[in-house]
Amino acid sequence: MGKFYYSNRRLACWAAGKNPHLGGSVEQWLAAINTDPSFRQTVKEDVQENREQPTAVRMFSWKVGSGPIDNPEKCDWHFVLTGERPAPSRPVKADEVVVVPQPKKVVIPTPPPPPAPYFRAVGAFAPTRSEFVRAIVERLTRLREESRAAALFAELPLEYPQGAPLKLSLAAKFAMLKHTTWRKWYDTSDERLLEAHPGGPCLPPPPPIQNPPSFQERVREFCRMKSCTKAFALETSLGLNKAWVGLVDIPSTSVCCADGKTTGGQTIAQEADPLQHRISTSVAPGRAQWISERRQALRRREQANSFEGLAAQTDMTFEQARNAYLGAADMIEQGLPLLPPLRSAYAPRGLWRGPSTRANYTLDFRLNGIPTGTNTLEILYNPVSEEEMEEYRDRGMSAVVIDALEIAINPFGMPGNPTDLTVVATYGHERDMTRAFIGSASTFLGNGLARAIFFPGLQYSQEEPRRESIIRLYVASTNATVDTDSVLAAISVGTLRQHVGSMHYRTVASTVHQAQVQGTTLRATMMGNTVVVSPEGSLVTGTPEARVEIGGGSSIRMVGPLQWESVEEPGQTFSIRSRSRSVRIDRNVDLPQLEAEPRLSSTVRGLAGRGVIYIPKDCQANRYLGTLNIRDMISDFKGVQYEKWITAGLVMPTFKIVIRLPANAFTGLTWVMSFDAYNRITSRITASADPVYTLSVPHWLIHHKLGTFSCEIDYGELCGHAMWFKSTTFESPRLHFTCLTGNNKELAADWQAVVELYAELEEATSFLGKPTLVFDPGVFNGKFQFLTCPPIFFDLTAVTALRSAGLTLGQVPMVGTTKVYNLNSTLVSCVLGMGGTVRGRVHICAPIFYSIVLWVVSEWNGTTMDWNELFKYPGVYVEEDGSFEVKIRSPYHRTPARLLAGQSQRDMSSLNFYAIAGPIAPSGETAQLPIVVQIDEIVRPDLSLPSFEDDYFVWVDFSEFTLDKEEIEIGSRFFDFTSNTCRVSMGENPFAAMIACHGLHSGVLDLKLQWSLNTEFGKSSGSVTITKLVGDKAMGLDGPSHVFAIQKLEGTTELLVGNFAGANPNTRFSLYSRWMAIKLDQAKSIKVLRVLCKPRPGFSFYGRTSFPV
């Protein structure tokens, strides 16, 4: 496939052709792509996914500018859709044009274009509303330009001294010259325009010459100016050097939802009441003196006014707002915003420049129906318009600070309505919701108006992409009972913001700063008994952990006459090790005036079951402690979740496991909690729990020194299917508890730990979820899950000890003669070998009075005890629990995935742990010091060729038949097979291992049967019959059948693996499904019958587990 060349026009044509049901012209799609980079990327990814289609090749394989659709006036859609070029209707010579030399003419330059109207495509294309919005924006833009010109040359305020000479600066004179030039271009009396534009320019008529205003007009203007005195005084008192202020109504079009619709299927009434935005014109240099005098007069007036006068002017004082934040009981409920006045919230930067701040409502929408449950409404919101950003960017501002965010909920309906409503505000450009959380406000609709304010201190760059997602609002309810088509609430969002320059701190009044430091203004309640939640603290303490890899290079050096060699310079690593770090701190804890809150009695939510694990006082390694059946824990507890489970039937929950145990750093105990969903290892660990069994399934390490332990088990991710409320034959989720490293000191008595199971059991919509694994020869990408090596023990001795962990990770672990297949070794076995950097963790599972210093390196073929050579290897010091990264050392840059017969782990690459200092312990201690190594991934893996390409795998061989009439039944279980009338030999390959270490599988298999004969080729007779069936022999259905002569020696067929539920479990004929029968009428004459299988793309596996055999 050739190279594709992309442009916005080509992507717009592709989107318009793919979505004819949405309507809209190519130019409208082009406008959406130009203004939304994320939408452009989505269209580009769609083209890349369909790059094999002929239409995509014809549209994007041409260089930009020479394609069939690049010219908007001559788009060859017939060629794009059919690939046919129209035949010429006459000879080509007839189309040739003879160019006659023409005398040179003077080219009149084209007039400067008028300002382009600002508009943005909103949501899906709706011609009526978009044209309405565009017309309004164009009209307002034209009015704004005319108002600017009028303010520069005509309309001076009445306060300006009449009759005084107008002193213009040099900049004003240049502006007048520019205006005169502009009028010259648009003057239709200019004869040059008739030559350049025959018929006259299509331009609006020139504005009429303005006469001096009459007395009536001046009186009318005086009354209009008096109505704007308060707004004008407020603007000028803040130091905004504006020459003219007006009030313009702009429709509320700032509500933007993903894909033009809400995520919860709700609708937003965008035809909200118009918002009042102040639009200020450019600076008028000619009136700088008048503005300065006006500002000084207003400041003297403000200083003369008393505190009560200021409160009467602003309708709210800062102390009243602060009491509202703290939820004072004596606060008078009134319909006022919680945002304090600007002069009280901010301190001015200087005499001539005030803070660039706006306090107004920038989002106002009505809620039609309340989303419930998981049907949450998401609203994308940008608090700062592009015009405002561009205006302050021209002034040198580089960032925007959102200091205050107010959420106001005005409900509609009956008083006392217990319908709850929650609005959550997050930072839209943060992927981690814990860090993005700004605050949430919850109220009951029957409590009336509810307001809340937050101080996020959110700062983002002026160069932020123009996306409507700076603030994300989520609206949800849990018990809405009203009609979905009724308007339930009006939600308004206000911001208090300022624009700051590079290396400038934001300016905040001392009272606001003090309140923010104390944490008192981080929570707010004013009306409706609003419950407000917001994060506390902002400073991150501790030392950040940094690791910067500085890559090496190569150079050429001379080693002899006309001889050079390439010298590789190794890379260096700059790192800072973090010893203590807190993501968030509570700034209230250091305040001396605040007292610690007492412990309160509480109950837990979501508790579904509980169990007890008994631990002996002398708990040794490999000790089996007990098993908890998850289904029995929930049913025996008989709580609310079990009742919900009975009602739902099928659930796919995320379990939270909490194991409450007292912390003790003197025992050195480490346990393993293994999640065995299909009851594969229960019978293997009841006597002695070998770590190979317990670590082959999903597991978690529990350290006694850390105390109470918790984790989450995503049943849908680990199993890929739903869970029935009663026991089934193919799954039985259990938690096995075993001891990995025993205690050094015997405790006083046996004890117990409590296991709590939390879950929200909601109904699942289907039985199958996302597959755990989809077959692909190149499925291994270097990442592991639940890869833990068995414990490594060091003796208390002065001799330097060495312990190794092999890196032949594709080798199947064994316990005696039993092979234990697991998913990690299966994935690695898909490749011949691998290289890269091993990233993992070391857990020192010893009592607190044990200590050791380890040197972790990678070595090839043996060990190095020469210290001078050893410490030249790249390695990592380990003194406590922590992570490490070590590059795999090998003369081939890779290590094999599996071993040959007679080889050991140390013959290849291995991770070696040298005890260069220690281990040490107090006198009387004789127990060994154990460590546990976990491998997380191979960073930047260097993978070899796949073990097998897209080819057939040997599944099973049948030989030594004892009967002539033989029938072999092939069900859903492909890993193992047994027979009493012939010898069975199973093939070992990655596909068979994948089936072994999963609970269910489904897909299509291509089968190939091959056989050899005992007798001479020409003297044999008989046939091989392959029949496809559904169900069982007694009540099932017969499908197609293939008969092959025994002398043909091979045959092919296919088999759909799956049952009525979608996927087959690893059991034989337990569910209504498809299967296949192979019948032989002269089986003794066949020496070997071999069955090969080849999975087709999309063959899926569900439920991670292991298989000891």
UniProtKB/Swiss-Prot annotation:
GO terms for cellular component: host cell cytoplasm; host cell nucleus; host cell plasmodesma; viral capsid. One of its GO terms (molecular function) is structural molecule activity. Specific enzymatic cleavages in vivo by the P1 encoded 3C-like protease yield mature proteins. The keyword Mitochondrion does not apply. It holds the Pfam family NeA_P2. Keywords: Capsid protein, Host cell junction, Host cytoplasm, Host nucleus, Transport, Viral movement protein, Virion. The keyword Transport applies. GO terms for biological process: transport of virus in host, cell to cell. It is found in: Host cell junction, Host plasmodesma. Virions are comprised of 60 copies of the coat protein. Belongs to the nepoviruses RNA2 polyprotein family. This is RNA2 polyprotein. It comes from Grapevine fanleaf virus (GFLV).
